[in-house]
UniProtKB/Swiss-Prot annotation:
It comes from Lactobacillus acidophilus (strain ATCC 700396 / NCK56 / N2 / NCFM). The lineage of its organism: Bacteria, Bacillati, Bacillota, Bacilli, Lactobacillales. This is Aspartate--ammonia ligase. Gene3D superfamilies: Bira Bifunctional Protein, Domain 2 (3.30.930.10). SUPFAM superfamilies: Class II aaRS and biotin synthetases. One of its GO terms (molecular function) is ATP binding. Its EC number is 6.3.1.1.
Length: 336
């Protein structure tokens, strides 16, 4: 269990005021996101059938929460880790056209999450996906989209600051871009997480690109990514430097999704060629799914960031080890 206890931490909002602020942030940001990205709110599942191949395998070792159901006794159901693959299928199923997209209010359970100030077994995020042309599968498209999301976050920050002056954390005004290989070349002696902290402190807001493939120096990936949704050459994480905890905080993970060619290549690298037989993967390899860009934006993380909170448990209700609860209480961190 990792836990950062900031010195002299005193929340500026009561629990009830915090709850009101959470509602305001969520409603404000999703309106900004829908407007700036041009995406429509759609209903989304909390669970999928395992055999569909639609669940997010994350790093390949996390165990999904699974159960059976009376109505379909021979089908194994899984609570989603994310909606990365489901969204791409939904765009086709619901008849979305070129440059149209959707966003959802996603709730997930990640039972194997390592808990700390930023991580909970309960995940809530705005999951979004948008159709693009094959020729738009490039770095320019990715960076333009990142800047739109950053714009939505900054617009929300401005409104939250006006409503809760003195209780809003000030974000950087610009977002920079860097690749994982550039980070390794610059700080080869540091771990990937240490590199992220270094660049976040330096830039205040940064989008770290190309996550999932092996780096040249270490021969290891910067971080794990499932091989069947993001194109590892066209993805990344949006992170901010968070002064209260002297740490980086990741708010969004996103990317241009795999093409037929990159899916085959990445499944081979991950030794997951057997997934080619699953319904989703088969459709993709047969060219039956649209080319897309998409990602997730953490709802609790954004609330935590904008309200200057010390722990994600101050803005969402979850389950925490007793030791963590006690240490937080002694440091004026009141977990919901």
């Amino acid at each position: 269990m990792k836990l950062i206890l900031p010195k002299d931490y005193h929340p500026t909002l009561t629990v009830r005021d915090t709850e009101a602020a959470i509602v305001y942030i969520r409603e404000t940001f999703q309106d900004k996101l829908a407007s700036i990205l041009g995406v429509q709110r759609m209903s989304a599942p909390m669970f999928v059938e395992k055999a569909s191949g639609l669940n997010d395998n994350l790093n390949g070792v996390e165990r999904p929460v699974g159960f059976d159901m009376k109505a379909i006794p021979d089908s194994e159901i899984e609570v989603v880790h994310s909606l990365a693959k489901w969204k791409r299928l939904a765009l086709k199923r619901y008849g979305f056209g070129m440059h149209e997209g959707l966003y959802t209010n996603m709730n997930a359970i990640r039972r194997d999450e390592d808990l700390d100030n930023f991580h909970s077994i309960y995940v809530d995020q705005w999951d979004w996906e948008k159709i693009i042309a094959k020729e738009e599968r490039n770095t320019d498209t990715l960076e333009v989209t990142v800047m739109k999301i950053f714009k939505a976050i900054k617009a929300t920050e401005k409104l939250v600051t006006a409503r809760y002056p003195g209780s809003t954390y000030r974000l950087g005004d610009h977002v920079s871009f860097i690749t994982t290989q550039e980070l390794e070349d610059r700080w080869p002696e540091l771990s990937p997480e240490e590199r992220e902290n270094k660049i976040a402190k330096e830039e205040k807001a940064v989008f770290i690109m190309k996550i999932g493939d092996k780096l040249k120096r270490s021969g290891k990936p910067h971080d794990g990514r499932a091989p069947d949704y993001d194109d590892w050459q066209l993805n990344g994480d949006l992170i901010f430097w968070y002064e209260p905890l002297q740490s980086k905080i990741e708010v969004s993970s996103m990317g241009i999704r795999v093409s037929e060619e990159s899916l085959r290549e990445q499944l081979k690298k991950a030794h997951c060629e057997d997934r080619e037989k699953l319904p989703f993967h088969k459709m993709l390899l047969e060219g039956k799914l649209p080319y897309t860009i998409g990602g997730g934006i953490g709802q609790s993380r954004l609330c935590m960031l904008l309200l200057g909170k010390a722990h994600i448990g101050e803005v969402q209700a979850s389950i925490w080890p007793e030791e963590m609860i006690e240490k937080c209480e002694s440091d004026h961190i009141h977990l919901l």
